[in-house]
Amino acid sequence: MEQVSHASSITPAQNASIPLEQQREDFKKNRFIAMPLAGTVVWALLGISAPFVSELTITWLLYIGTGAIFYLGAGLSYLTGERFFAKKAAKNSFDRLFFVGMIMSLMVFAIALPVAAIDHTTVPLSIGILAGLMWMPLSWAIEHWIGYFHTLTRTFGIVAAWYLFPDARVEAISAVIVAVYIVSLITLERRFQSIKSN
């Protein structure tokens, strides 16, 4: 979900002299929907396919699918206008902060993988929660409630689904994640349109 800044005429060397508050204001102007769109598509496909494949297959699909979210999001960013890898786009400190937050979330997989080796049914629980953690620093950076809502609702919803639907965990957890993504996408797009109109 790394975003590009609208201050495209600023070079990285010049960026160091821009006050953090100005960098934050530039960062807040981003749309932020490419990655959630990718996540929605992937988790919907995982939930739909789960009843028709073996437990081993869905476990692999969870790893592969969630790993593909970044690449799908990067591709979608060219359709949404976010253009993650545009050469003229200036990156700022908040882009880097979000990227570091994403790496931090991925490092927690060091806990999830050994646990999954003991009990593969924990994979949708752990991946679903870990992948949602990066919304917290985003919420702080853009000074908007949606990231906090996303992480908290997703986490509690996933835990509830994991306990309430032991025979359909992937389907239930996917449904929770997709529902939270839909709310997040609508909110982010409304936020972006509001910023654009001002």
Locate the predicted segments by residue.
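Alpha-helical transmembrane segments and their membrane-interface exit regions
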Residues: 67-75, 129-138, 178-188
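Selected alpha-helical membrane-embedding segments in polytopic membrane proteins
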Residues: 40-97, 103
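Small-residue-rich segments of transmembrane alpha-helices in multi-pass membrane proteins
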Residues: 41-43, 95-106, 153-165
